[in-house]
Amino acid sequence: MIVAVAAATIAVTPALAAPDRAPASVAIREAMAASAAGWNAGDLARFVAVYAEDAVFVTPKGLVRGKAAITARYAPSFTGGGNTRGRLSFVPAELRGIDPTHALLVARWTLTGATSTETGMTTLLFERRGDAWKIVADHSS
């Protein structure tokens, strides 16, 4: 299971393009790009920095609760100073503001490895926490 993170520019829907929400789309885009860069550099801490401490992650095997558990779930993929699963990218399908402190991102993730490519969809609920936008719910398939 892969958590989608942005390596590409996010297409902003009109709901987030309003002047009062434009900074949200920029901040989410930057947080996702930093997370993707962490994945691709083999930096687990940087990859999971986008998650809130109390985030939930829905996987085919069940619910993972909390950033520490999400980090532990991904740790086996980050060995020897790299990432053993390949290069992560995604194509956003929709980024929609829900209210001033919440936004929903739907995207297709792609993981390109040496011998195979995996792809799927993800739905990420972001919440503004202080000066940062954090993933509070991740459903990837």
Explain the meaning of each model-derived region.
Residues 20, 71-116:
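Surface-exposed, charged secondary-structure patches
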Residues 119-141:
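Short beta-strand edge/turn micro-motifs at domain boundaries
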